[in-house]
Amino acid sequence: MTELLKLSAAELGAAIASGETSAVEATQAYLDRIAEVDGQIHAFLHVAADKALEQARAVDARRAAGEKLGPLAGVPVAHKDVFTTKDMPTTAASKILEGWQSPYDATVTERLRDAGLVILGKTNLDEFAMGSSTENSAYGPTRNPWDTDRVPGGSSGGSSAAVAAFEAPLATGTDTGGSIRQPAAVCGLVGAKPTYGTSSRYGLIAFASSLDTPGPIARNVLDAALLHEAFSGHDPRDSTSVNEPVPPVVEAARRADVSGMRIGVVKELSGEGYQPGVMQRFTEAVELFESLGAKIVEVSCPSFTAALAAYYLIAPSECSSNLARFDAMRYGLRVGDDGTRSADEVMALTRAQGFGPEVKRRIILGTYALSSGYYDAYYGSAQKVRTLIKRDFEAAFQQADVLVSPTTPTTAFRLGERIDDPMAMYLADLCTIPTNLAGNAALSVPCGLAPEDNMPVGLHIMAPTLADDRAYQAGAAVEAALRDKWGGDLLSQCAYAV
């Protein structure tokens, strides 16, 4: 069974389709792996073993009936616990939703089921996707499989840890300020933020509606592309959904060629203040692009220096509005409802006990930024910076086909190291936030281990809106070249590799 864990998602899907193995065998192999190691990693909040095997049997029955299966039919997937699932709990890693089960599936969930993927369960995250370390979960932190004393990044840390520990070949995540790319980078994985509006938010528990983007986490670029295509596309139930063809990311991942491509190195997203080992691996990756026939150009995006400040006004402002729905009246936790208290008192008690410290911090910050007398000075100014960032991206993409930077300024930090220092925590998303504010596409691919701590470093590849395929094409090219250089995948060096 261990041999099945070593297969890529594409290879596993092909093996199931050909009858070389079965969906049940693949699912059981991953369920056994979860039982073996998740006590140490804590990637999952809920494992749906019986339901997963039931889904797997249905895929095998379809094949036995002669039906042609899709490329990921029967392949297990771990699902971030912010996507609603009608047959298992959805908590957003918050006490306020403990035990709650949605009456409907999110579009991402629905499309994965339709594509025949087997949902193993729901993964841990920072509460309501607010955080960069998965330490803000009400159900305890997830640990990085490369070093269990370190964080797996966040907020999609459970999904990244599950894939890195070979508890799942694929996982879903959400990216609001870097919450897919950052954990993928520090866990030695591939993670993508699709163009905003190309992957549906219907059934996604909202953090910041103008920023939240579902995306894939995988062990290689092709696997990420296959998952990306499986759940993307227009959805009339999401008012922000883009009615455009899904960028051909699978085709681009298979092309894996950067000859003649213009690669723009963003001046403002590297250099001073970055961990030396991160900069070393990033510089080597840029040189590798050049050796593969790409043209390297330096680009400047001055507004990016204000991106972090703008994001931490815009995102909390939207969160303060979105989380108002958790009012102790309709669903979720209800505290103090003994008949002696008013509805307002019950609501206040419920929120006080149901929301964690980081969520409360962001609600307060957002409410202040939107308050009378401060709206223009804070939220209004942040939106103006957002416009400048979009313009800087547009200008940069006149000079380059894709832009690159490190994915994170440092490798994974130690558990507890930044939990009491919000500003230090927020800096983990320094390189990824501009892409969310602009809405364009980005991909993180592993580019080596930092010499100081032997922890993974991510290469961040940014592409224009609806040109996700460019990022995948460049990412696949550098991935193939590095695989040749290393003599295999970087993940084979992980402490939890099989």
Swiss-Prot record:
Write out the catalysed reaction: L-glutamyl-tRNA(Gln) + L-glutamine + ATP + H2O = L-glutaminyl-tRNA(Gln) + L-glutamate + ADP + phosphate + H(+)
Its EC number is 6.3.5.7
Annotated Gene Ontology cellular components are: glutamyl-tRNA(Gln) amidotransferase complex
- Which molecular-function annotation in GO is an example for this chain? glutaminyl-tRNA synthase (glutamine-hydrolyzing) activity
Any one Gene Ontology BP term: translation
Identify the enzyme class. Answer: ligase
Q: Where is the active site?
A: 80 (charge relay system), 155 (charge relay system), 179 (acyl-ester intermediate)
Q: Which domain of life is it from?
A: Bacteria
- PROSITE patterns tied to this protein: AMIDASES
Q: Which SUPFAM superfamilies match?
A: Amidase signature (AS) enzymes
Could you tell me the keywords of this UniProt record? Answer: ATP-binding, Ligase, Nucleotide-binding, Protein biosynthesis
In residue numbers, the region (Disordered) covers 132-159
Q: Is this entry keyworded Ubl conjugation?
A: no
**What do we know about how this protein assembles, alone or with others?**
Heterotrimer of A, B and C subunits.
* Similarity-based family: Belongs to the amidase family. GatA subfamily.
Protein name (record): Glutamyl-tRNA(Gln) amidotransferase subunit A
Lineage, highest ranks first: Bacteria, Bacillati, Actinomycetota, Actinomycetes, Streptosporangiales
